C-alpha cells in the first residue's frame, strides 16, 4: 500500500507570503493545498509552479469566513487525501485595502471575519479530525502590529492579529493530548513588490527607519520560522517573532 502523503493547508496562499510558505512546505514533501478566496488565476499559477518544480500542489477555493464552506473544505480534504496534517492560518484582509464606501463598522467586520473568524473556523474543523491525525501542526500567522499598531486605520487589523495569540494558546492547550502543536508566527514588514507599489519608495524607506536592522524582511526569511514550527515537536503555545527589531526600534 502506498504511504499516505502528509497534507498542508495554507490559507490565503495565492500570492506573497502565503505562496512562499506553500512552496517551502512543498519542498519538505507535503501535498500543499493553496487556498484562495477570489484570485483563481494567481492561485492556480502558484500551484502550477510548485508542480513544475517537482512538488505536489492543488489550488482550492474557499472563503474561510463562511462556516459551511470551511466545513465542506475540510470534509473534502479528509475524503480525498485523508485529512489535513498542517494548517497555516495566513489569510487576512490587507489593512490598506479599505474601500471608500466601507463604514467603520463594515471595515471592522470585514477584517475580523477573515483574520480572526476565519482562523477560528479552520482551527475548529482541524480539531474535529484531530483524534485521527496525531502529531499535527497549526501555525497562526500574526504580525508585529499585534503589539505595535501604527495608525488609526489599522486598529481592526492589529486587533485581529493580537487575538490570534490567544487563539494559539487556547488551541495549544486543547490539542496537546493529540501531540498537536499550535504556534504563532509574527512577522514584521515584508518587502514585496505589491507592498512597495502601494506605499511608494519614500514610504518604504520611512518604514524601514523604524526597523532596527534598517530593512524589511523577505518572504523566505519569514517562511524559515514556519519550517521551524512545523519540524519542531516540543514547542507549542509560543510566538516566533521575525521582524528585524521592528517591535522595539524607535
Enumerate the predicted regions with their spans:
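Catalytic Tyr-X3-Lys loop
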Residues: 101-121, 139, 164, 208, ...
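Conserved mid-core segment of classical short-chain dehydrogenase/reductases
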Residues: 71, 92-109, 128, 152-156, ...
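Active-site loop of short-chain dehydrogenase/reductase
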Residues: 5-6, 55-56, 82-84, 130-144, ...
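A glycine/serine/threonine-rich, flexible loop-to-helix segment
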Residues: 153-155, 173, 177, 184-211, ...
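Catalytic loop of short-chain dehydrogenase/reductase
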Residues: 92-94, 139-163, 168-177, 189-190
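C-terminal substrate-recognition "lid" of short-chain dehydrogenase/reductases
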Residues: 215-242, 247
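Conserved glycine-rich cofactor-binding loop
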Residues: 14-15
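Amphipathic alpha-helical dimer-interface segment in Rossmann-like NAD(P)H-dependent oxidoreductases
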Residues: 114-133, 172-173, 177, 227
Amino acid at each position: 500500500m502506498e504511504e499516505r502523503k502528509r497534507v498542508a493547508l495554507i490559507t490565503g496562499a495565492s500570492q506573497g507570503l502565503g505562496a512562499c510558505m506553500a512552496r517551502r512546505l512543498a519542498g519538505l514533501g507535503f501535498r500543499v493545498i493553496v487556498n484562495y478566496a477570489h484570485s483563481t488565476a494567481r492561485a492556480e499559477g502558484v500551484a502550477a509552479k510548485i508542480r513544475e518544480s517537482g512538488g505536489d500542489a492543488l489550488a482550492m477555493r474557499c472563503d474561510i469566513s463562511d462556516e459551511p464552506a470551511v466545513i465542506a473544505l475540510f470534509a473534502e480534504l479528509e475524503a480525498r487525501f485523508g485529512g489535513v496534517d498542517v494548517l497555516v492560518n495566513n489569510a487576512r484582509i490587507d489593512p490598506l485595502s479599505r474601500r471608500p464606501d466601507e463604514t467603520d463598522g463594515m471595515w471592522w467586520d470585514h477584517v475580523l471575519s477573515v483574520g480572526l473568524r476565519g482562523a477560528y473556523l479552520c482551527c475548529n474543523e482541524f480539531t474535529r479530525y484531530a483524534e485521527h491525525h496525531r502529531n499535527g501542526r497549526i501555525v497562526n500567522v500574526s504580525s508585529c502590529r499585534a503589539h505595535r499598531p501604527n495608525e488609526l486605520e489599522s486598529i481592526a487589523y492589529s486587533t485581529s492579529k493580537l487575538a490570534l495569540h490567544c487563539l494559539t494558546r487556547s488551541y495549544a492547550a486543547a490539542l496537546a493530548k493529540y501531540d498537536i502543536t499550535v504556534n504563532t508566527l509574527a512577522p514584521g514588514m515584508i518587502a514585496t513588490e505589491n507592498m512597495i507599489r502601494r506605499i511608494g519608495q519614500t514610504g518604504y524607506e520611512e518604514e524601514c527607519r523604524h526597523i532596527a536592522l534598517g530593512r524589511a524582511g523577505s518572504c523566505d526569511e519569514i517562511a524559515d520560522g514556519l519550517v521551524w514550527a512545523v519540524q519542531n515537536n516540543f514547542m507549542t503555545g509560543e510566538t516566533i517573532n521575525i521582524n528585524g527589531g521592528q517591535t522595539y526600534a524607535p
